[in-house]
C-alpha cells in the first residue's frame, strides 16, 4: 500500500482539483440569480453549522484526489443535465454547502453504486464477517456511508493545544441512528479483532472485477443488525451512548428500542459503532501512521450538533432553499459575531457608535477590519478628521471601538469584501453586501484558501479544509485543520541525538531543541592531578585521550630530556620539548647577543640542556614588575640566567581611590600591597538617599546602604526589616491565624488576618458598661472609650447661679456666662471672673484697688487691696474737670496736679506768721487749704473767651437774644456738613455749576404747572456723584444713580412744595470761610477785673508781683 509523502505544516493541492476550493467549478446550466440564491442559502448554513471535514484515506495524496473523484462515478448515476443536478441538490439543502459541489455529488453516487454491488455480494456470501475481512484486505480505507444527511454532521476537531490526537471514535448523531464512527482506517478496524477470532471468522472470498474503473471503489456492505450483534458478541460490556449513565437524552427522539426496530425495517445501511474507551486503550498500536489519524469530538460540539439537528427537524421553514419575504431566512447563529451583525443589520437594529443612530439598510457604511464594527460612512469621516481621533505619537486616526490606528480616511462606500463600490440593497441578500463570494484570505495564517462564504460582515470563519502535518519528531503524520498554528506531538520518544553526540533524547515528541544530556560523567584533567563530575557533553572535543579539561595548575611532568619538568599550565598531551636544549637556545640570557657571536669570541659550545648559557657581559635590561606606566624599571645586573634580583629604585603607588600617592622602595612592593588606603571619607549618598557612605577610601560605584530600614510599617506594630531603601516600605507580611472579632463577638474575620487589619464593623448596639444609665444609641466599636453620651439633661452651672436645660450628658463643667460675684477673703471685693470652677483665688491675694475714700479729696485710695493696713499716702490719680471763669474752657486734670497751689499757700501762710515761728510757736498748715478751695480752682480765660465776652456785651447792647438769628448764620451753617464742605473745596467750580442747575430746577417746578421735574447730569466719577447727592438733600431734591461704570450718572427730581433753595449757597459759605480774618480785640484786664470781683485765688496769685520773703524790715 503506497503512502503519501509526509507533509509538515504545508499543503499540496492539484490545480485541477477544484473540489477543495468551493465555488470554482459551478454548474454551467444555472443562471446567475438561481446560483446566487443557492449560494445565499448555502452560506447561511455554512456560517452557523459545523464545517464538513475532508476525510481522505492516508494512502491517497492530495494530488490524486481529482483522479479518485473522476473514477468514482458509476454508470447510470451521473447527472444527465444541470437541471437534474439542481433538483437533486434541492433535496439535500439541509446539508453543508460543499455537498452541492460536483465532487461531493459524485462521491454520494459512488456510495450508492457501492451499496448495490454489496447487496449482490451478500447474496453470494452468507458469512458477513468474511465479507468484512475481504473488504479490509482489498482497500486501506474505512467503509463509510456518505448520505446527504450524514455529510453535514461529520465533525473533526483537532487538539487546539497541539497535543497528539487521541485514538477515540468520532461520534455524531444521525437521523434515526445511534452514535456512528467515521473516518477510521481499515487497518485500525482490523485491529479490533483478536487474531484468534480473525482466523475463525475470516475466510477468503473471490470477488470478480467487472469494471477496472470501479475496482478501487468496491466495498462490501453488511447488514447493520448483523454488525451490531457481532460487535455485542466481541464487546459484551459495550452499551449505546443513550444507555450510559448521565448521558444526555436526544431531543425529539423515540426510545432507542423503537428506533432500532424502525431502522431495521428501513433497509440495510452500513453503521459501525464506536469502540469503548477501555477497549480503545487496550488495543495495541501497530503503526505510527495510525496514532494521530482521528480527531476527538468534544462534548460541547456534540451537544451543539444535536441541538442544530433538532432545530432543523422541528422548523421546516428554516430549511427552505429559497429566501422568501423581506428578510433572508438563513439559519443564523446569534452567538457568533457575524450572525449577530447580520441579524442586527437586517432588522435595522444596529447602532452607529459615533452618532448613536440606527444603521439603515440603504445608508452608506464603513466596517473596521480590526473589530468589524459598522459605522455610517459620513460619521466615520467626521470622526477621522476630528482632533479627538488622532493617535498619540502616531500618524493616522483611531477607530472609535478598538482604537486601531488607520492611515487613510475612508471615502468610498464598498461592500464588506471590498470588491463592489456602492452596492445596491436587495431584500434577498445581506445588507451592504455584494452577494458574491467573499474570497478574502485569512490574515496571519498559513492557509492558501480564501473565504468561501458570501460577502458578509464580521470576521471570516476558520478554513474548513484539512491537511496532514508531521509531528515534531518527524515520525508520524496527523490530519489537522488548515491554517491552525498548532504544533503536532505524538506519543513516541524523540530519539534525537543530544548535544553530547552519544545519547538519545528520551522525552516525548516535543518542539524546539532537545534538553542537554543529563548523564553525569567523571572527568580527569590533562595532568591527572584533579578530577570533576560534569554533565555529559561538557567540553566536548577537548579530550586528548587521557584528560578532558585543564586544572590551571603547573603541569610538572618530566620532559624528554629527563632533567627538567614541564612548567606550563595543565595542557593536553604531549608536553613541549625542553626549552634549554642547545638547538633551541640561540641568544644569551638577556637576549641581546646571539650565541653564534659569543662562540666566535671563544665561548664554549653547549652540548646538553644542563650546560650553562654563555653570558654576553652587558647590562641585563629586562623590564621589572615595579615602576609605573611612564617610567618602567629595568634590571641593572649583568647578563645572567634565572630571575632578576630586586630593584633598588622607588615606585610611586596610589591609594585605592586614587586620591593620594606615596613612594615605596621597590623591594617592599612584593611584601606589601601595591595599593594603600587613604583617610578620605566618601561623602556621596547611598542608594537609600537617607545616609551618606562615610567609607574610608571608597571605590564603590553603587553605594549600597548596609543598614536596616527600621521604619514603622502601615500596621503600626512592626518595623521594616529590609535594607535601607528609597520610597515607601512594603506592606507588613505578618499575619495572624486567630479569629479577629468585634468587641461583642458578633462580626468575625477568619484567619489568616493580615497585620494591621482593623476589627470588623458591627451593626449591633454597644454592649459595654457605661457611666450613665441613659439609652445607648451608638453601635459596637473597637475603640477603648465609647462616644460621649448626648442625652439632654438639666445641670447647675459651676457657680450655682442657675439650672440650665438641654445640656448633653457628657458635659460636666458648665458656665452660665455671668460674673462670679462671690465675696473674696478680703471681705471688701467680689470675684470679677465669669462663672468658673473651683476657688476664686488660688495661692494669691486680692489685687483689686482699695475703695476707701481719701480724706483730702474724697476719691478712692486705688492702692492694691490692704484689708488690715491703713491706706498708704500717695498722690491721687483720679481725674477731675477744671473750667475757666466763663465756662468755655474745660480740661481733665489729675487731682494731685489740681492741688499744686499747696506750696504757694504754705509759703504765704508762713510769711504772714514768720514772727510767730521766730518766737517758737508752731504753725498748722493743714488748715490753710481745704477741699472747698481745691474745688474752686479755675482755669485762666484765653483770647477767645475775651472775644466771646465782647460779643456778649454787644448783644446785650443791641438787645439780641439767643433765640433770634438776624443774619441767618445758624440756619445756613447747619445745612452743609463738614464732609460736603471738604469735597466742595476740592472742586469749587463744579459745585457752583451744580448749584445753579438745582436753583433753576427748583424755580422751574415752583413756577410751572407740573408737580415734578427732573434733570439728568452727565456721567461722572464717584466723588462728583456724592457731592450731587449731598446737595440734593440740602435742596430737598430726589437723587438716583443709573447705569454702570464708567457711564454711571445722577438724575435729580424737584417736587413742588418740598424742594426749596437754601438762603445761602455752599459756594458763598466756603468763600466766606476762606477769607482772611481780622485780628481779635485786645482784652481789657482792668475792666475784666472790676467786672469779676469773685475771681479765684489762682488768678490773683498769677497776677501778683513776686514777693521777696528774705527782705525783712525791722
Swiss-Prot record:
It is an enzyme of class 2 (transferase). Residues 72-103, 121-142 have a biased composition (Polar residues). The modification Phosphoserine is found at residues 50, 81, 92, 126, 130, 147, 320. One of its GO terms (molecular function) is DNA-binding transcription repressor activity, RNA polymerase II-specific. InterPro entries: NFX1_fam (IPR034078), R3H_dom (IPR001374), R3H_dom_sf (IPR036867), R3H_NF-X1 (IPR034076), Znf_NFX1 (IPR000967), Znf_PHD-finger (IPR019787), Znf_RING (IPR001841). This is Transcriptional repressor NF-X1. Residues 988-1056 form the R3H domain. Belongs to the NFX1 family. Residues 143-156, 185-202, 232-248, 304-315 have a biased composition (Basic and acidic residues). Disulfide bonds: none annotated. Binds to the X-box motif of MHC class II genes and represses their expression. May play an important role in regulating the duration of an inflammatory response by limiting the period in which MHC class II molecules are induced by interferon-gamma. Together with PABPC1 or PABPC4, acts as a coactivator for TERT expression. Mediates E2-dependent ubiquitination. It comes from the Eukaryota. The lineage of its organism: Eukaryota, Metazoa, Chordata, Craniata, Vertebrata. Residues 20-220, 232-287, 299-325, 1071-1095 are annotated as: Disordered. GO terms for biological process: negative regulation of MHC class II biosynthetic process; negative regulation of transcription by RNA polymerase II; protein autoubiquitination. The keyword Magnesium does not apply. Its EC number is 2.3.2.-. GO terms for cellular component: cytosol; nucleolus; nucleoplasm; plasma membrane. It comes from Mus musculus. Keywords: DNA-binding, Metal-binding, Nucleus, Phosphoprotein, Repeat, Repressor, Transcription, Transcription regulation, Transferase, Ubl conjugation pathway, Zinc, Zinc-finger. Its main location: nucleus. PROSITE patterns: R3H (PS51061), ZF_RING_2 (PS50089). Gene3D superfamilies: R3H-like domain. SMART domains: R3H, ZnF_NFX. Ubiquitously expressed, with highest levels in thymus. Residues 9-26 are annotated as: Interaction with PABPC1 and PABC4. A zinc finger (RING-type) spans 352-403. A zinc finger (NF-X1-type) spans 447-465, 500-519, 561-580, 626-649, 688-707, 715-734, 826-848, 857-878.
Amino acid at each position: 500500500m503506497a503512502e503519501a509523502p509526509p507533509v509538515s505544516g504545508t499543503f499540496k493541492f492539484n490545480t485541477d482539483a477544484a473540489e477543495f476550493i468551493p465555488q470554482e467549478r459551478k454548474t454551467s446550466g444555472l443562471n446567475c440569480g438561481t446560483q446566487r440564491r443557492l449560494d445565499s442559502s448555502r452560506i447561511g448554513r455554512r456560517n452557523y453549522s459545523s464545517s464538513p471535514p475532508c476525510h481522505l484515506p492516508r494512502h491517497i495524496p492530495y494530488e490524486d484526489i481529482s483522479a479518485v473523484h473522476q473514477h468514482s462515478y458509476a454508470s447510470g448515476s451521473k447527472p444527465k443535465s444541470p437541471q437534474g443536478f439542481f433538483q437533486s441538490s434541492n433535496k439535500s439543502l439541509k446539508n453543508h454547502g460543499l455537498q452541492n459541489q460536483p465532487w461531493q455529488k459524485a462521491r454520494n453516487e459512488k456510495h450508492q453504486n457501492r451499496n448495490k454491488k454489496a447487496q449482490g455480494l451478500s447474496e453470494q456470501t452468507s458469512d458477513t464477517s468474511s465479507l468484512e475481512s475481504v473488504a479490509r484486505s482489498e482497500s486501506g480505507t474505512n467503509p463509510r456511508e456518505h448520505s446527504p444527511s450524514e455529510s453535514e454532521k461529520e465533525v473533526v476537531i483537532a487538539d487546539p493545544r497541539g497535543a497528539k490526537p487521541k485514538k477515540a471514535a468520532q461520534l455524531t448523531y444521525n437521523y434515526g441512528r445511534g452514535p456512528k464512527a467515521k473516518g477510521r482506517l481499515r487497518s485500525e478496524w482490523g485491529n479490533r479483532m483478536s487474531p484468534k477470532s480473525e482466523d475463525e471468522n475470516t475466510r477468503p472470498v473471490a470477488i470478480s472485477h467487472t469494471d477496472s474503473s470501479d475496482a478501487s471503489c468496491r466495498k462490501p456492505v453488511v447488514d447493520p443488525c448483523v454488525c451490531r450483534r457481532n460487535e455485542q458478541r466481541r464487546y459484551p460490556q459495550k452499551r449505546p451512548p443513550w444507555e450510559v449513565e448521565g448521558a444526555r437524552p436526544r431531543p425529539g427522539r423515540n426510545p432507542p428500542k423503537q428506533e432500532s426496530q424502525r431502522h431495521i425495517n428501513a433497509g440495510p445501511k452500513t453503521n459501525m459503532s464506536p469502540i469503548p474507551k477501555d477497549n480503545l486503550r487496550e488495543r495495541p498500536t501497530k503503526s505510527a501512521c495510525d496514532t494521530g489519524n482521528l480527531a476527538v469530538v468534544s462534548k460541547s460540539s456534540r451537544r451543539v450538533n444535536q441541538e442544530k439537528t433538532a432545530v432543523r427537524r422541528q422548523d421546516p421553514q428554516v430549511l427552505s432553499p429559497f429566501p422568501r419575504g423581506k428578510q433572508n431566512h438563513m439559519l443564523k447563529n446569534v452567538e457568533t459575531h457575524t450572525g449577530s451583525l447580520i441579524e442586527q443589520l437586517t432588522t435595522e437594529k444596529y447602532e452607529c457608535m459615533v452618532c448613536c443612530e440606527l444603521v439603515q439598510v440603504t445608508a452608506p457604511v464603513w466596517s473596521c477590519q480590526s473589530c468589524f464594527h459598522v459605522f455610517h460612512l459620513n460619521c466615520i469621516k467626521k470622526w477621522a478628521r476630528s482632533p479627538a481621533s488622532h493617535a498619540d505619537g502616531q500618524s493616522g486616526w483611531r477607530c472609535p471601538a478598538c482604537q486601531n490606528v488607520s492611515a487613510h480616511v475612508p471615502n468610498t462606500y464598498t461592500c464588506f469584501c471590498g470588491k463592489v463600490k456602492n452596492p445596491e440593497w436587495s431584500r434577498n441578500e445581506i445588507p451592504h453586501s455584494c452577494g458574491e463570494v467573499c474570497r478574502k484570505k485569512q490574515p496571519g495564517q498559513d492557509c492558501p484558501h480564501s473565504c468561501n462564504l458570501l460577502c458578509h460582515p464580521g470576521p471570516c470563519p476558520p478554513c474548513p479544509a484539512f491537511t496532514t502535518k508531521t509531528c515534531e519528531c518527524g515520525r508520524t503524520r496527523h490530519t489537522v485543520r488548515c491554517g491552525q498554528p498548532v504544533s503536532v506531538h505524538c506519543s513516541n520518544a524523540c530519539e534525537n541525538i543530544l548535544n553530547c553526540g552519544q545519547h538519545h533524547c528520551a522525552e516525548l515528541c516535543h518542539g524546539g531543541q532537545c534538553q542537554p544530556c543529563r548523564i553525569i560523567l567523571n572527568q580527569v584533567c590533562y595532568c591527572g592531578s584533579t578530577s570533576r563530575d560534569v554533565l555529559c557533553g561538557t567540553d566536548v572535543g577537548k579530550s586528548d585521550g587521557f584528560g578532558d579539561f585543564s586544572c590551571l595548575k603547573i603541569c610538572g611532568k618530566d620532559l624528554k630530556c629527563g632533567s627538567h619538568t614541564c612548567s606550563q599550565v595543565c595542557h593536553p598531551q604531549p608536553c613541549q620539548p625542553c626549552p634549554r636544549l642547545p638547538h633551541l637556545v640561540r641568544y644569551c640570557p638577556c637576549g641581546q647577543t646571539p650565541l653564534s657571536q659569543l662562540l666566535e669570541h671563544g665561548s664554549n659550545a653547549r652540548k646538553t640542556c644542563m650546560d650553562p648559557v654563555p653570558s654576553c657581559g652587558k647590562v641585563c635590561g629586562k623590564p621589572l614588575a615595579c615602576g609605573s606606566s611612564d617610567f618602567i624599571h629595568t634590571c641593572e645586573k649583568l647578563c645572567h640566567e634565572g630571575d632578576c634580583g630586586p630593584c633598588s629604585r622607588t615606585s610611586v603607588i596610589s591609594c585605592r581611590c586614587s586620591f593620594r600617592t606615596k613612594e615605596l622602595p621597590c623591594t617592599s612592593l612584593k611584601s606589601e600591597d601595591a595599593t594603600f588606603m587613604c583617610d578620605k571619607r566618601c561623602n556621596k549618598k547611598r542608594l537609600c538617599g537617607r545616609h551618606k557612605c562615610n567609607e574610608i577610601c571608597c571605590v564603590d560605584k553603587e553605594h549600597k546602604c548596609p543598614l536596616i530600614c527600621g521604619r514603622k510599617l502601615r500596621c503600626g506594630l512592626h518595623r521594616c526589616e529590609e535594607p535601607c531603601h528609597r520610597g515607601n516600605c512594603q506592606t507588613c507580611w505578618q499575619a495572624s491565624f486567630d479569629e479577629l472579632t468585634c468587641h461583642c463577638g458578633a462580626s468575625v474575620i477568619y484567619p489568616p488576618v493580615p497585620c494591621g487589619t482593623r476589627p470588623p464593623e458591627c451593626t449591633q448596639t454597644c454592649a459595654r458598661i457605661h457611666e450613665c444609665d441613659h439609652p445607648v444609641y451608638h453601635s459596637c466599636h473597637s475603640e477603648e472609650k465609647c462616644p460621649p453620651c448626648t442625652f439632654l439633661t438639666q445641670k447647675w452651672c459651676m457657680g450655682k447661679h442657675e439650672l440650665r436645660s438641654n445640656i448633653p450628658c457628657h458635659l460636666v463643667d458648665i458656665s452660665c456666662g455671668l460674673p462670679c460675684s462671690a465675696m473674696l477673703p478680703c471681705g471688701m471685693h467680689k470675684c470679677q471672673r465669669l462663672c468658673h470652677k473651683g476657688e476664686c483665688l488660688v495661692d494669691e491675694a486680692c489685687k483689686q484697688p482699695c475703695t476707701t475714700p481719701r480724706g483730702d479729696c474724697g476719691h478712692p485710695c486705688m492702692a492694691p487691696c490692704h484689708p488690715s493696713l491703713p491706706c498708704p499716702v500717695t498722690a491721687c490719680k483720679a481725674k477731675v474737670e477744671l473750667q475757666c471763669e466763663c465756662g468755655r474752657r474745660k480740661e481733665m486734670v489729675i487731682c494731685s496736679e489740681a492741688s499744686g497751689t499747696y506750696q504757694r499757700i504754705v509759703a504765704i501762710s508762713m510769711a504772714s506768721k514768720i514772727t510767730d515761728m521766730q518766737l517758737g510757736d508752731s504753725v498748722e498748715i493743714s488748715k490753710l487749704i481745704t477741699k472747698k478751695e481745691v474745688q474752686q480752682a479755675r482755669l485762666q480765660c484765653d483770647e477767645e473767651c475775651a472775644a466771646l465776652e465782647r460779643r456778649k456785651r454787644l448783644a446785650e447792647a443791641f438787645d439780641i437774644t439767643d433765640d433770634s438769628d438776624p443774619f441767618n448764620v445758624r440756619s445756613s451753617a447747619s445745612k452743609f456738613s463738614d464732609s460736603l464742605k471738604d469735597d466742595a473745596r476740592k472742586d469749587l467750580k463744579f459745585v457752583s455749576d451744580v448749584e445753579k442747575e438745582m436753583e433753576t430746577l427748583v424755580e422751574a417746578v415752583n413756577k410751572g404747572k407740573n408737580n415734578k421735574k427732573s434733570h439728568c447730569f452727565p456721567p461722572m466719577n464717584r466723588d462728583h456723584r456724592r457731592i450731587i447727592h449731598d446737595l440734593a438733600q440740602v435742596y430737598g431734591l430726589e437723587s438716583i444713580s443709573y447705569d454702570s461704570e464708567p457711564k454711571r450718572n445722577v438724575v435729580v427730581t424737584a417736587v413742588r412744595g418740598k424742594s426749596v433753595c437754601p438762603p445761602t449757597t455752599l459756594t458763598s459759605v466756603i468763600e466766606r470761610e476762606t477769607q482772611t480774618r481780622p485780628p481779635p480785640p485786645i482784652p481789657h484786664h482792668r475792666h475784666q477785673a472790676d467786672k469779676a470781683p469773685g475771681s479765684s485765688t489762682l488768678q490773683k496769685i498769677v497776677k501778683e508781683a513776686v514777693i521777696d520773703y528774705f527782705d525783712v524790715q525791722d
